[in-house]
Amino acid sequence: MMKLVIALCLIGISAAYVVPVYYEIYPEDATFDEADIEPQLSPAELHHGSIRERRSLQPGAPSFPMPGSQLPTSVSGNVEKQGRNTIATIDAQHKTDRYDVRGTWTKVVDGPGRSKPNFRIGGSYRW
């Protein structure tokens, strides 16, 4: 269950940092029939709606996590190979001028040192 919560948190954070791609609603080479064109509406008859913008990780989009972010919270993940073991690490921290909080989740996911996950949580408060 904990793996699912962590995976969903990472998906949510990555979706928040993705840049939307704008597509042209009416391209220049499109053709319209005269029967399909709607008459002009008065301001009282206007209908307001929104178009959902698609998100994309295309070139030019900011990297994750965003460098130089002004947010006090940061989350980072890492998968590395140490000898024959593969270790996954997720680190989250929140820093303000009054306190610091940090949490780390580590697990050997593959190899002879395979084990249950380790958790570390710590904090400090400045008077």
UniProtKB/Swiss-Prot annotation:
Record keywords, A-Z: Antibiotic, Antimicrobial, Cleavage on pair of basic residues, Immunity, Innate immunity, Secreted, Signal
Propeptide: 16-55
Tissue: Hemolymph.
A GO cellular-component term linked to this record: extracellular region
UniProt-annotated location(s): Secreted
Annotated InterPro entries: Coleoptericin
Polar residues biased stretches: 70-84
Entry function: Antibacterial activity against Gram-negative bacteria but not against Gram-positive bacteria.
Protein name: Holotricin-2
Species, as recorded: Holotrichia diomphalia
